[in-house]
Amino acid sequence: YDARSAYNWNCSFVYEGKVYDNVGYRLRQRNARYSGNGRRSFKFRFNLGSYPKFHNTDGKSYPTEWKYLATHKMKGSRGNHTWGIEQAANHILWNMTGTPAPFTHWFHMRVVRGAEEAPKGGNGQYQGDYYGMLLAMEEFDVRFLDAHNLKKGNGILP
């Protein structure tokens, strides 16, 4: 049992109007996951046979469905704001040159905890549904090989 890889919680995940129930999720990014700014990076694991087909920032669907969704909080572990630009730019450039790298896109996330989207009051905006912008990153798995037209057994996967 590897506690750092355990999916400790379940949620319902909604994407383009489709609901994915009992999706496992956990925190990710080593010690940066506990940084004090309240933003967290997550890893979601979708259920067998119910994988979403995400699309890029241009609205084009990725070649394969994703079993995992890794998110980046877009803030460095030393408190610097990166907005995910370094990760996204690197991955885009690597893919453009024929070097396989994860697909990335930005998205906004909402965490529904109550009936009101943004409760009234001085602190209401911080108690509402809007969690913020995150960077979505494709996971290295068999679907990555298929999406990037790679042969199985090339040794890049753990």
Question: What are these language model-derived features?
Answer:
Residues 1-158:
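Phosphate/dinucleotide-binding and metal-coordinating scaffold of catalytic cores
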